[in-house]
């Protein structure tokens, strides 16, 4: 069984991964001209934003 500290560390890493992924999508969006591809990347980026919020909430719950 994981301790709260271990779980918090794990999900802090997950949070950082999600932030990094969102940044990659944003950088690609800025450099592309193809509206279809941009639309897909924006959708994925928005999903990453949701993952970031969920990871933050999960970390809060673990730490409480």
State the predicted function of each range:
Residues 1-64:
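Non-heme di-metal
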């Amino acid at each position: 069984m994981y301790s709260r500290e271990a779980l918090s560390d794990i999900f802090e890493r997950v949070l950082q991964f999600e932030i990094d992924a969102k940044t990659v999508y944003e950088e690609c969006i800025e450099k592309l001209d193809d509206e279809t591809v941009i639309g897909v990347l924006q959708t994925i980026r928005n999903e990453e934003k949701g993952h970031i919020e969920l990871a933050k909430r999960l970390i809060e719950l673990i730490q409480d």
